[in-house]
Amino acid sequence: RLTLAMATVASLCAVRRAARRKFGGASAKAFVLLSCVQFHHLFYAGRTLPNTFAGIVVACATAAWLDGQWRRAIGCLTAAIVIFRAELLLLLAPLCVLVLYHRHLTFFALAKLGIGVGAAALAATVAVDSYFWRRPLWPEAEVLYFNTLLNKSGEYGTSPFHWYFTSALPRALLAAYPLAAASLALVPKARPIVLANLFFVVV
């Protein structure tokens, strides 16, 4: 758990460095301060949960996104989708749209990258999880089957549509919540990544 917590901190440090390069030193310092006072993130930093592992990879993808390293950002998110959390496709989708719109990558290059990383991640997760569960297994495929095809996600419990905005995000983000909203109006360079994350939450 200590190693996992250190990996979480290292991924946040990568975001801090990228934020400094993108938005300046004051923004990087504010990110450190906000990260230190957010209880939920630090509480789960060393817990062996899929969301914790996915969070590390997504933080690395965020740092790459801020630095304009599009291949690395897309590769990280693709791996996280296949191995840890399939719903991260909703975060990858707007990134791919932006990359194609601004012609950072061609569609062929994007598809080649996604297929290559996805295949490698699939081989890794099937090999590891099949070994430990002693049967052929792709965990995220089973989750999708249960939640989507069988439509049984409601068995985990349901919440109103506004729950993320009125309960989960305020508790998780604290002061960063209103600041993220303000950045849409005040920081044009932040809009793409904020809107992409907003799309992820809404959908």
Language-model segment annotations:
Residues M6-V37, L195:
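Transmembrane-helix signature of polytopic, membrane-embedded enzymes
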Residues F43-F53:
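Short acidic/glycine- and proline-prone juxtamembrane loop motifs at membrane-interface regions
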Residues T106-I115, A127-W163:
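Extracytoplasmic catalytic-loop and juxtamembrane helix elements of membrane-embedded
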Residues R1-A10, Y44:
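Loop-to-helix entry region of an early transmembrane alpha helix in multi-pass inner-membrane enzymes
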Residues T62-A80, E87-L122, A181-A185:
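Perimembrane helix-loop-helix junctions
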Residues S167-V201:
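Hydrophobic, aromatic-rich transmembrane alpha-helices
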Residues A28-F39, A63, T78-V82:
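Short helix- or helix-capping micro-motifs
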Residues L12-R20, F39-L42, V58-D67, P94-H102, ...:
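Hydrophobic transmembrane alpha-helices
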